[in-house]
Every structure is written in structure tokens, then in C-alpha cells.
Amino acid sequence: MRGILTDDDNGNPRSVQTEGGISVLYKGRYLYSKYAPEKAVKSAVLSKSLAPGTLVLACSPVLCLCLAELCASLPENCFVLGCEFDAALYDFSLKYIPLGLARFALLSPDELPKLPFMLTKRRAETKDGTPLPPAGTFRRVLRTDFSAGTQFFPQHYAALTEAAENAVARFWKNRITLIKFGRRFSRNLFRNLAHLSRSVPIERVAQSVEKPIIVFGAGESMEKTARSIRSVQSAFYIVAADAALAPLFRLGIEPDAVVCEEAQSVIAPFFLGVNGKRFRVFAGITSWPKLFDLCGADICYFSPHYDDTVFFDSLAERNIIPPVMPPLGSVGLTATKIALMLRKNDRVPVFVTGLDFSYRAGTTHARGAEAHTSRLASSCKTAPASNYDAAFTFFMQKIIGKDGTPFFTSPALLSYAQTFRAYFSQSPNLFDAGTTGIDLGLSKKSADELIRKSGNTTEAKTTAEGKDSNEAKTENRKPAVKMETAIARKDADGKAAHAKKTIAEQAAFSEQKARSVRDFYEEEERSLKRLKNILSSGQNMSENERSAEIEKLLRSREYLYLHFPDGLTASLTVSFLKRVRAEIDFFIKDIAVGKSILGNS
């Protein structure tokens, strides 16, 4: 009778001699073949052809068999990343990693969840100090199982591989976005810096909302929610994505806050009809600069981390730009992030609606949204208002929504939904009030439950009998009028004192921020003019001196070239530097505009 397989006395993995060589015994199973362990690994690992720019996920390396051969045969821009979710196997693997192994790093179990973020960073390293290749090195991900240790956490390894693939794909999608809009983002940033001194610091309003918060996107599901809460809207703090502003006004809802990230003037129609409306705007520092003129001083800026650059990091370290927000891709996700930041504590519920990330055939947004009204305005016999083209283009896919009916979504919208689930599914007291669209991974709350959460169940009834009853009660309340008046006066005095303090704080903030932005403008203008002179005339410098100075000036000014198709890193080639020289004049002009705004403030 065969004996029972056991680990060592402490339950740790141990190496054992088998017929074909050394294997590992752990949790009652062999992690390698008993007959030919190395041969089996070699056929699984070395038989795969690798293209340049491949990240190899070496899952559960354990004895690290064939690892040296794999690393030695790697093509250009390839790297092997050891991944181990089992703590005991991780400690065991450390003893078997070949010395001096190039292009390899082993991630511990607590580092593995951070891998997708590490793949999008300019600089990242493991906890033992091994540097990882910078973002943009990899174009694909390949998983290779080095042992049967992956069977202890099969879902974890599958999720890790998918997350790594999504991170690499997202980086290159963002690169395409930067090629298209990178210059616009940077120029908007330079101009919006001049408005910071007259804006409201976002830190001042953080954790200030005690009422339940509703976040409105512009999807179809927002209409039902808006109608349901219209009579009790004052019981909620309402945050709207920019595209949801017009539909909310149409439904009789006035939001307390609007979130904007759009960098172009296409956002202007979203604000038609806002005269006389009072709401606070939360705008990205890279958003359309004219937003400040539309909204006045009641605007809070935040900094979308649109690219991982030395320039952006230096602005953040010097406290010139507002607090940095993660790059979430969609204004609906950013609105959710801001809502969570605004609530007093985790006990304040936040509801999202209209974040459908999909739509029915014929309609793409809620009625009243700019996309809907422009379609109505341009409709004719041959081009009806119903937009069926959007649902049946070749890249769209059909899904079943939360209500069991078919919807259509695009790869971009689907990625936003996936990002939402990854960022917010574990957030406490965050609920989905939408009834249609893609599932967001949140607990569901109906509109009736929203109203119950707000503490308003019905509107007061005004009948003749009720009116008589109120008149009868008036006499009984007269003794309390003086006390209520005194309390109101005391409350007003307190508010006045708070207002004076706020005004003083705002004045100090404005003065300090204006000074720091002005210093930044002066410093950046000098550097740009110096770079312009070097590129134009050479400044009587030797070739080596000129190259070193150009490289130094470009190192912290990625905004000059990040939108180039080949602008992932700076280059000293003539064609690259000629394009940089052409960009300098744009930013010198933007600095002049910013200084003019500061001078008029």
C-alpha cells in the first residue's frame, strides 16, 4: 500500500528525489513530473517563440528549472517576471534563482496585485530593489507555468495575466490618445495654472458633504432616477458628469456640482442655459480653459495624471498643481471618485446612475443630452433622429444589461466599466441606482430606497383641514418665536465669523498660489528660450556640450514632444529636434497668456 505524501514537519515545500530527478513535494502533491521533471518544463517553457517586446510571466517558478536558458534566449525588450502567490513557495523559490540572472525579477505575493500599476510607471522596482523596464517597453504578455504550483491559486494567476495584458493594452491606447491630444493637454495646463489663484482649493471641500450623494452620468438610466428624486432633490448632494448637465436641467434637477475633464471646446454646448444656476465645477487642470470664464470663481481644479513624466511629477512635488487624480479614462468615473472624496465619511452613502457604458439600439444618451439634441436638430427623412449606426458598427458587441434586455457596447465603453469595477467595487456604501446598462459590481439600490435613505418619504400634503390645523398651532408657537430668533441670530453670527475666516484663507491661498505660478512661468520661459537659442544657433558650444545641455533641458520638459508618434522618449536626432524647436513657440505664447491672466487677476 502506498504511503501518504506529506510535506516537512512545518507544512513547507521540500525537494525530493524521484526516478527522473529532483521534484518538490507540497500539500500532498508533486509539483514536477516524477519521471522527467526538467524535460517536461523545457518542453513547456522553451518551446514557445517570443516576439520582441514580450513580458513573460513565469508563474510559480519553484525550482527555477530552465529559467537561465529562457533569460539567455530573450529577444530585444523582453523580460521575465517570476510570479508566486503562495508565500511558502515564494520563500522556497528564492533559494533556487540562478546567481547573476539578467532580465529577471521575482514578485512576492503582496507585490502581485500592484503589477498592473507597475507596468504603467516610468520607474518601478521590486521590494528587493530590482528595477523593472519602464512603461512602453512591452507590447504583449505571455504566461508560462513553471510548475504545478499554479494549481493552488488558478483563478489568481488567470486574473493576474488578464490584468497585465489590460495594463499593457491600456498604456498603448493612452499613447494614441496622447499623440492626438497631448499638446492640447499640456497647453491647457499652462493656461489653467493662471486661474488657480482665483479658484477654490479642492482640499477645502473634501469630506464636507453629510447628505447622501448621487452621481449622474448621461446614460439612459439617469432619467428614471432623476424623475424619482425630483420632489426631494434638496435631500441629496447631486454630482453630474458634464454631459448629464442638460438632461438634468430638462428634468427639473439642479446639480450641486459638475465634473469636467474635456480638453476641447466641444464641451461648450453642455453649459447652454446655465445662466442663473448655482453649482460648483470640478475641472481637470488640462480641461478647456474657457470653463473658468463660464463658471466664474466657484471652480475647483484637480490634476488628471494624463502621463507619467518628470515634468508632471515636479509640478506635483512643488505643490504648483492641485491634488493628482488617477487616470480613470471616463468623466463618469472621475465624478464617482470626487463624490467619494466629498463625503464626510464612509457612512455617507453614494449612489451612481447613468453610468451605463452601453446603450439600446437607436439611442446613445439620455434625452436632452447634447448628443441627443444635436441629432434631433440635424434629423431629416434620410437621417432620422434615432442613431442606429452607433449600435451596429463592426466593432460593437451585444450584451445583456442589468434589466435582462440587450444593449450594445464598444471596446472603449467596456474598458471603462472594467476600470470602474476594479477601482470602486470594494468602496463602502457605494451603490448602483441605475436600472440599465453594464453591471458595475456594486450593490443595487432602487430610487425608492434612495429616497428612504435621504429621510424624505413623501411630500407634505396641503389640504384645507391641514391648513386649519396649522393656523391653530400658530398661537401655541408664539412663546418659542423669541428663542428661535435668538438661536437664528447666534447661528448667523457664527456663519459670519466663519465667512470672514474663509475669506482670509482664500486671500492667503490666492497670493501664495499666484506667486508660485508666476515663478514657474518665469523659470520655464527662461529654459524654453535657452533651448530655442541652442537649437537655433548652437551658442558657440561644442557638439558634446550642446548635446548634454539639450538632453538636460528636455529631460524635465516632456510636454514638448510627448505627442510625437516617436515621443515615448527624447531623441537627439535632427528630425526630432527640429520638431521640438517648432513646439517651443507655442508654449512661450501660452506662458505669455498665463502671465497676462495673472496680471489682470
Where do the language-model regions lie?
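C-terminal catalytic or substrate-handling cores of phosphate/nucleotide-
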Residues: 285-453
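Short internal beta-strands
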Residues: 79-85, 236-244, 256-262, 279-286, ...
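Class I S-adenosylmethionine
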Residues: 1-55, 63-69, 185-202
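Gly/Ser/Thr-rich loops at beta-strand to alpha-helix junctions
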Residues: 59-67, 85-89, 111-113, 218-222, ...
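Long, compositionally biased charged/polar accessory segments in the mid-to-C-terminal portions
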Residues: 389, 393-396, 400-461, 465-467, ...
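Aromatic- and Gly/Pro-rich donor/ligand-binding loops
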Residues: 157-211, 222
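Acidic/Gly/His-enriched mid-domain segments of enzyme catalytic cores or analogous surface patches
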Residues: 90, 94-179, 249-345, 561-601
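SAM cofactor-binding core of SAM-dependent methyltransferases
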Residues: 58-105
